[in-house]
Amino acid sequence: MYVLKNGQVLNASGELENKDVLIQNGKVNLIADSIEVTSGEEFDATGKLIAPGFIDVHVHLREPGGEHKETILTGTQAAARGGYTTICSMPNTKPVPDSKEVMESLQAKIKETAKVRVLPYASITTSLGTDELVDFEALKEAGAFAFTDDGVGVQLAGTMYEAMKRAAALDMAIVAHCEDNSLIYGGVVHDGIFAEKEGLKGIPNIAESVQIARDVLLAEAAGCHYHVCHISTKESVRVVRDAKRAGIRVTAEVSPHHLILDEEAIPGNDGNWKMNPPLRSKEDRAALLEGLLDGTIDFIATDHAPHAAEEKNVPMEQAAFGIVGLETAFPLLYTHFVKTNEWTLKQLIDWMTVKPAECFKLPYGKLEEGSVADIVVLDLEKEANIDPATFYSKGKNTPFVGETCIGWPVATFSEGTLVYNEGEIK
C-alpha cells in the first residue's frame, strides 16, 4: 500500500488540483484532499503531477531473436523510466509470433521478465511478410493484442481484405505499417530536400498514402477496426480524415519524432537520423500537428526501435531503420509543445493515456477511484539533457542527443508496485 502525498492531479477541465492518492491491492483506492497515512508507505509527491501511466501501442522489444538490440527486460525497464505502464510489442522477432505455440512462449517470457504490462501483437501473415494468413482465432486465444505485420506493408489487397474479415469476426484490430513496396524505390530517407542534397534515394509520400487509401476501403467493406501506424504524410492525414467523416472505423497514431522534426533538421548523412517512415517535409509535419489537434490522428505512439551501435553508427545507406523513444517521449513533447503553449498539459496526457486506451478498448489510462494503479509521477520543473548513456534501453540510437528537456517522469507504479523511482529501476 502507498499513499502519494501532496501531489497534483488533472481534473476533467484540465486544471491542476492538490490531492493525495491511496494505492491499495493494485488499485487506486481513494483520491482526496488529504489522506492520513496509517499503514503502508508514504510517497512524497510534493509539487509533482500524479497522472495515469502512459500507454504505447507501438514498441519493438526485439526478443526473441534480437536480444543484442533489446530484451523484454531492458525494454520494459526503459518503459518504466519513461512513465509507460502498458506497451504493445511488435511481432518482427525471430521467431515471429505467428502461431499459438510461439505466442504462448512469448507470453511466458513476458510474465517472467517484464517490469510493466506487455501486450504482444501477433503477425497477420506467417513469418511476417508472406501471403499466408495466421490462425487468427488460435492467436487471440493465446493472448494476442491485435494483428500486424509491422515493418512491412501487406502487399496484396486480397490478403489484407481476408485478414480484415477474420479480425472483424473476432472483434480484433488490424494494425498496419503502410508501405507499398513497389513505390519505395530503395529509398533510405524522404524523397525531398535532404535526399537531393546528399544524393540519397528517397521514399515518396505515396509509398505510405496509397496503401492507406486502399486499406480504408477494405476496412469499410470488411467492417474492421483498422489502425494506421506512425502516420507521416499530409496525404495520409487527408485520407484518414475523409475516412473518418465517411464513418469508417479507422484510427491513427503519430510518433514524437514526426511531430518535432522534419527533413530540414537532419544534420548530415548520419544513421541515427534514419527511420521508417522517414522525417518528411515541413508541410507534412504541419499536417500531422493539425491532424492531431483536430482528432484525425487519435494519439501518440513512440515506435521505439532499438538497434545495436554498429547498426546505426554508419551512413544511412547501410544503417538500420529506427530510433528509440520510450525514455524521452514525454520530456520532448512537454518541452516542445506544452511549454510553448501549443498544447495543453491535458491534451498531451490524454494522447499518451486515455486516447490509446479508448481506441483499443483497454481498461487502463485513467486515474480515478477503482482504476488499476498504473501511475506516473512527473516533475514538470525538472530539467535535464538527453543522454543515451543513462538509457535503460540497449538501444542508444536517438537524434535528440544532448537536447535539454523540461518535465521528466520521476516515479512509475505498475499495478500498484513501484517499478521506477528517482533514476532507479526497482
Curated annotation (Swiss-Prot):
Q: Which GO terms describe its molecular function?
A: allantoinase activity; dihydroorotase activity; zinc ion binding
State a single Pfam family of this protein: Amidohydro_1
Q: Which residues bind Zn(2+) 1?
A: H58, H60, D150, D303
User: Which UniProt keywords are present, listed alphabetically?
Assistant: Hydrolase, Metal-binding, Pyrimidine biosynthesis, Zinc
User: What residues does Zn(2+) 2 bind to?
Assistant: D150, H177, H230
Catalytic activity reads: (S)-dihydroorotate + H2O = N-carbamoyl-L-aspartate + H(+)
- Give a Gene Ontology cellular component term annotated to this protein: cytoplasm
Record's InterPro entries?
A: Amidohydro-rel, DHOase, DHOase/Allantoinase_Hydrolase, Dihydroorotase_CS, Metal-dep_hydrolase_composite, Metal_Hydrolase
Copy the pathway line from the protein's UniProt record.
Pyrimidine metabolism; UMP biosynthesis via de novo pathway; (S)-dihydroorotate from bicarbonate: step 3/3
Q: Does the keyword Membrane apply?
A: no
Its GO biological process annotations read: 'de novo' UMP biosynthetic process; purine nucleobase catabolic process
Q: Which cofactor does it need?
A: Zn(2+)
What remark does the entry make about the cofactor? Binds 2 Zn(2+) ions per subunit.
The residues listed in the UniProt record as binding substrate, with positions renumbered to this chain, are H60, L61, R62, N92, N276, H307, F321, G322
Q: Does the keyword Zinc apply?
A: yes
EC numbers for this chain: 3.5.2.3
Active site positions, chain numbering: D303
**UniProt similarity note:** Belongs to the metallo-dependent hydrolases superfamily. DHOase family. Class I DHOase subfamily.
Chain's role: Catalyzes the reversible cyclization of carbamoyl aspartate to dihydroorotate.
Task: Please identify the protein, giving its name as recorded.
Answer: Dihydroorotase
Question: What organism is listed for this UniProt entry?
Answer: Listeria monocytogenes serotype 4b (strain F2365)
Gene encoding this polypeptide? pyrC
